């Protein structure tokens, strides 16, 4: 048994709540929608699996190698130690076996599917576009409010600049404020899979939670449907863009 020492609502506030519902119409444009069945506080799929905090485990690391990073030091590694306000999630250390179960059954399974899907798309179509969809708080601690949308392409290294420009322009056309790579330049998923020279393009989209939900209660707001409808437009433009890219490969 793993004892949790924070209220459930604090764990929910760490989630990318309802993002899969915002994008659920993407399949209508021919996209494949892959969403996590576990919350970020259980396993953070947008981390390297080696980003593990040794202090969390009672009998050693689940895997032989751990990688230190500012995220791990802050308690936000692949298996997070802290919740939304920095409070400790667990009342006591968890076992190595419990950590390994999360990594093998959730993390490894998810990323194996992503890798295989991207490989299949490249074999069939000559290219693949991965849009890594997330939500972000409306402000970071005591800093100024964040923009509506933050696009992360690892400063141009994870996808064709035309893709980032198209998405940025599309959001602006719909009335959203947009930032590139600040404060989020793209996480592990974007860095790991974005290989433009191999025709695999990865772009991270962070959506301000204040646009579509009540951040305190973690419930959809009255504007949820508008944001969802706008995202259908974005996905349709992405589909058209990918079709043009595919055609250019055959010329």
Question: In which residue ranges do the predicted regions lie?
Answer:
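N-terminal catalytic or cofactor-binding beta/alpha core of small enzyme domains
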Residues: 1-130, 135-203, 207-251
């Amino acid at each position: 048994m793993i004892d949790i020492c924070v209220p459930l609502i604090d764990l929910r506030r760490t989630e990318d709540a309802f993002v899969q519902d915002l994008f659920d119409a993407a399949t209508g444009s021919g996209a494949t929608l892959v969403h996590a069945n576990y919350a970020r506080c259980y396993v953070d799929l947008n981390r390297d699996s080696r980003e593990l905090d040794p202090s969390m485990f009672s009998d050693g690391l689940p895997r032989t190698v751990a990688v230190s990073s500012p995220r791990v030091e802050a308690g936000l590694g692949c298996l997070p130690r802290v919740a939304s306000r920095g409070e400790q999630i667990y009342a006591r250390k968890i076992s190595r076996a419990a950590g390994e179960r999360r990594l093998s059954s959730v993390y490894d399974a998810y990323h194996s599917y992503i890798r295989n899907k991207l490989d299949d798309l490249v074999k069939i179509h000559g290219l693949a576009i991965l849009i890594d969809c997330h939500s972000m708080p409306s402000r970071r601690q005591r800093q100024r409010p964040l923009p509506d949308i933050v696009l992360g392409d690892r400063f141009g290294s994870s996808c064709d600049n035309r893709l980032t420009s198209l998405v940025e322009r599309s959001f602006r056309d719909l009335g959203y404020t947009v930032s590139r790579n600040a404060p989020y330049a793209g996480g592990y998923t974007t860095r790991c899979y974005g290989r433009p020279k191999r025709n695999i393009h990865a772009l991270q989209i962070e959506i301000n939670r204040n646009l579509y939900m009540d951040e305190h209660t973690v419930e959809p707001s009255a504007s949820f449907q508008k944001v969802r409808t706008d995202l259908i437009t974005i996905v349709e433009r992405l589909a058209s863009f990918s079709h043009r890219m595919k055609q250019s490969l055959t010329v």
